[in-house]
Amino acid sequence: MWTANILTLFPDLYPGPLGSSILGESRKNGKWDLNITDLKLFSEKNKRVDDSPFGGGPGMVIKPDVIDRALLSLKSNDFPIYYLSPRGVKLDAQISNSISKLDGMTLVCGKYEGIDERVIKHYNMIEISIGDYILSGGDLAALSLIHI
């Protein structure tokens, strides 16, 4: 069964759009599965998921240990890992076609200035952008990618 794993700070965003229309019906009929992982559950005692970028820089990034623990918790973690990022490869028909042939995918949704670069490299994440515009985070891009 095709599976989408989503790592996000906003898990409540997904059930509505993915529970209605043709996607909702196909999920009810067992055609695909959705695993939403709340990154906040993988924070330490202080409940902080963000920190200054390693090596300096503006803003805050999601901490690498939070992403690491969340990825390791997935039941099916052998899927390609896509990090939704404005600096990623721009989504086009060829990429969409290759994604549609996968058995599943893991989507990491950034927030703030993104996620720590070290975790992107460690997990060989594929950075992908859905276009040249600014969104409030990776969640709306993840919803778009799931619709492929």
Describe each PLM feature range.
Residues 61-111:
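S-adenosyl-L-methionine/SAH cofactor-binding core of RNA-modifying enzymes
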Residues 113-120:
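Short, glycine/polar-rich helix-capping loops at beta-to-alpha or helix-loop-helix junctions
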Residues 1-74:
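N-terminal nucleotide/polyanion-binding subdomain common to many enzyme families
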Residues 146-148:
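Conserved small/polar residues in nucleotide/adenosyl-binding loops
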Residues 5-7, 35-37, 82, 105-107, ...:
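Hydrophobic/aromatic beta-strand patches that form the interior of the parallel beta-sheet core
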Residues 40-45, 89, 134-137:
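A short acidic, often aromatic-flanked loop/helix-cap motif at beta-alpha or helix-coil junctions
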Residues 126-138:
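Short beta->alpha connector loops at strand-helix junctions that form conserved
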